[in-house]
């Protein structure tokens, strides 16, 4: 299993950050990586997610929301067409660090033998996309505050 982690401090309340993260209909406005999410922020919901790759191509994923704790944690998990090849779980956790600041812990967990094949390239691409998304999210959240 491989875990790729990132975090960012936001000058915002948890409720504002949560509202923006779970408003999937506006991802296309602010998110350079996840350009569309079709579905609702509900436990068990199967989403259709469009992701722009580093090379500018669009990939479609269909993960399911596996955890939803309001103002705290959102997770979705997807599987490849080939069982056991590559599974990914996107994790967003908010921590209130002070009255005016919140930390977003943003990570991706990968499992399956595809992680061996993709290896270093997978890690670099995902690290880059997490950072791009974090920076865009910070800009959006702090603009709303």
Predicted stretch roles:
Residues 36-40, 49, 95-96, 123-126:
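Juxtamembrane/interface motifs at transmembrane-helix termini
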Residues 50-54:
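Short aromatic-glycine motifs in intrinsically disordered, low-complexity regions
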Residues 2, 45-47, 90, 102:
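Short beta-strand micro-motifs in enzyme catalytic cores
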Residues 16-21, 27, 47-49, 65, ...:
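Hydrophobic pocket/interface hotspot
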Residues 103, 109-145:
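A conserved amphipathic terminal alpha-helix motif
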